[in-house]
């Protein structure tokens, strides 16, 4: 089980996201993270093992500006509870960040194919495989993001 919160608006996204994650704490989780797009259009990801309060402490001296963001609390299904396995996950270029709830049944096969193409993985989660697959389709076929996501979702057995 996980909690997913997203925000696009005029206010700073970080406080909205943290408030949303705190409302979902009762569901149980082992890690928390946020991805924010700042005013310079940079994508920043901050994540940690532990509670939302641990995430708040971790980012206390970091730039959490931006009016667009996603946030996630994770209950591990693939990979141990640790900072590397916490969501959101970056693509190799760090241009995409993804959070996900569910299980990608054929993630190991997809991961192996992507590794043979030079992709490097920093976690043992199925979600990181999905964000790398999206980027692979986007870059190798010169596709827009929506089409790359659609192709990536066709190439998996099960996203629940």
Name what the model sees in each region:
Residues 1-160:
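Conserved short alpha-helical segments that host acidic/polar catalytic motifs at enzyme active sites
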